[in-house]
Each structure stands twice: as C-alpha cells, then as structure tokens.
Design a protein with these regions (language model features):
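Acidic, metal/ion-coordinating pockets
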Residues: 1-212
Length: 212
C-alpha cells in the first residue's frame, strides 16, 4: 500500500495562492498528521524507531553556492536532534531537461559529502538519471507524478524510487533500490491524474534507459 508520510513544500508554485494559501496547506498537512519540510522548517518522522529527517530547498536565483555553504549546517542540526537518516530534496534545474546541469551535480554531490543519505530532485517535469555517489543515491529528477494539467503531456513517463536502508553502527547504508516505471495517467489520450505502472517491456526500457 502506498501513502504520503512527508511532503516537501519547496517549489515555484508554493505561493500560487499567496501566503494564506501556503499557511492553509501547512495547517491541512499537520491536521492530517503529515510533517512537511521547507527551508528553515525540517520535517522529522520516526518509523519503527528510526528517526528520519527531511530538508527541502529550491535553487532559483542561482543559489547553488549559497546552499553548498548552508546545507551542511542544516544536516548537522538534524543529526544533533538524533536523526538516523537525512533526506534532502531540491527543486532545481530547467524545465524539460533530461539531464542535470553542472550546478546540480556540484550541489548534489556536496550534499552527500555533507552527510545526506539520499538526495531527491524535481522541477524539470522530466525524469533524469540517478547517480550513485560515495555510497549514496542522487535522484536528479523524479519527473511528474500527479501533475501537468488535463491535456495530454508531451512526456508521460515517470517512476517510483524505492530504497532499502539499514543502520549499521549508527550509520545508514543503502542496501538496494527498486525502480517502478510508470505513466502519469491511466489513459494515454489525456491526463486523468492516476499514475499507473507500465506493463509493456518497451515503455519500461524507455524509463530505465533514461535513468542510467
């Protein structure tokens, strides 16, 4: 069974309904028992005794160097609060790009070097490759999922990223991951906001080839 356990609120649409819309979103999430992460507001979730911290940022305005300097302190602050696993989410890159730019790679790798256990990116509306760097994974873009309007998007491919981590002597190690290639809609003629796993080999291969 799937579900939503934590939400990132860092993206370029978060203020589409103004400050009041953002505050209502936060209140709704908290009322549902779902912690959210935004810059300056980390989320902490405990699962089976494991404390997971989430950080979220957006890079618009060329903030890569600023964040390379800032994020290590934020990661350490979560460690100081007892977090066993730290996940960092970035809203970054350019729309419709299938590959990360040099600044994304620099920031993603610096984030792992600073102690993040997983880096997850989004914004391009396209899936991007996954990098295995210093024992950790950087998902440069998850693509769309339940998004993109009612018309048929030009690219409907997406995927689920499942990772299994194990704590060894207080350190999280990435043991295995699984990719579930999907289409953002159960239909092919328009978007019905019902993400559906692919079953045909050719579509699955398209997703996997893009992620390599």
């Amino acid at each position: 069974a799937g579900g939503v356990d934590t939400v990132s609120l860092e993206n370029n649409h978060v203020l589409d309904m103004g400050d009041s819309g953002l505050e209502e979103t936060k209140e709704t999430l908290l009322a549902a028992g779902i912690p959210y992460a935004s810059e300056g507001e980390p989320a902490i979730l405990t699962v089976k005794g494991v404390k997971i911290g989430s950080l979220a940022y957006q890079t618009f305005g060329g903030r890569h160097d600023e964040l390379i300097a800032k994020v290590p302190g934020d990661i350490q602050a979560l460690r100081d609060q007892g977090c066993d696993i730290v996940i960092v989410s970035y809203h970054w890159g350019a729309e419709k790009d299938y590959y990360p730019n040099d600044n994304q790679v620099r920031l993603g790798r610096a984030t792992v070097d600073a102690g993040a256990d997983l880096v997850v990116g989004h914004h391009s509306h396209r899936i991007n490759p996954i990098e295995y760097y210093n024992g950790k994974y950087i998902c440069y873009s998850l693509g769309n999922f339940s998004f993109a309007g009612n018309n048929k998007p030009s690219d409907m491919t997406t995927f689920l990223f499942q990772i299994r981590m194990r704590l060894r002597d207080g350190e999280a190690t990435s043991e295995a991951f699984k990719i579930i290639p999907c289409r953002i809609s159960s239909r092919t003629d328009y978007n019905d906001f019902a993400p559906t796993p692919y079953t045909d080999d050719s579509s699955i291969e398209v997703v996997l080839r893009t992620l390599r």
